[in-house]
Amino acid sequence: MDYFTLFGLPARYQLDTQALSLRFQDLQRQYHPDKFASGSQAEQLAAVQQSATINQAWQTLRHPLMRAEYLLSLHGFDLASEQHTVRDTAFLMEQLELREELDEIEQAKDEARLESFIKRVKKMFDTRHQLMVEQLDNETWDAVADTVRKLRFLDKLRSSAEQLEEKLLDF
C-alpha cells in the first residue's frame, strides 16, 4: 500500500496538509504499539512495524521535496538509489560558483552578505519549486525528476547557508 492510500489521500503533490495531520494522528492512535502491549508477540511486532510505516509515510508526505520524490518513485523513478546526475552544465557551474561565494562569505564572516545570499538562494529554490509543481500537474515525469535533482542541490545549499548563519550568530 502506498503512503497516499495509507492516509486516504489522492496520490498528487498538492495535499490538504490539515487532513494529512489529522489522519496521521488518527493512525498513530489506532496503531500505537502500547495498545498492543497485552497482545501476542506477533501482534506487538505487527503494531511496531505498522507504526514505523505510518511515521515514515508522515515524514515523506509532509516534506514537499520528499513528497515529490515519492511521487516520482510511484511512477518508476527511484531518485534515492539512481546513478543519474544533473547534466545541465550551466546549472552545475552556477552551483559551484554559489558554493565558492558561500565559502567567501564564511571566511569574511559577512552577515549582511550572507543574509542577501540566503534570500537569493531561497528565490532560486522557490522559482524551481514552482516549475516542479507545474511539471507535476502536467505529469511530465522526466522533467520533474530533473527539476527535483536540481532542487536537491539548492536545498543543500540553503541548508549550508542557514547553518553558517547560525554559526555566525553564535559568535
From Swiss-Prot:
Keywords: Chaperone. HAMAP family: HscB (MF_00682). InterPro entries: DnaJ_domain, HscB, HscB_C_sf, HscB_oligo_C, J_dom_sf. It holds the Pfam family HSCB_C. GO terms for molecular function: ATPase activator activity; protein-folding chaperone binding. Belongs to the HscB family. GO terms for cellular component: iron-sulfur cluster transfer complex. Interacts with HscA and stimulates its ATPase activity. Interacts with IscU. It comes from Shigella dysenteriae serotype 1 (strain Sd197). Co-chaperone involved in the maturation of iron-sulfur cluster-containing proteins. Seems to help targeting proteins to be folded toward HscA. Coiled coil: none annotated. CDD domains: DnaJ. The keyword Lipoprotein does not apply. Residues 2-74 form the J domain. GO terms for biological process: [2Fe-2S] cluster assembly; protein complex oligomerization; protein folding. This is Co-chaperone protein HscB.
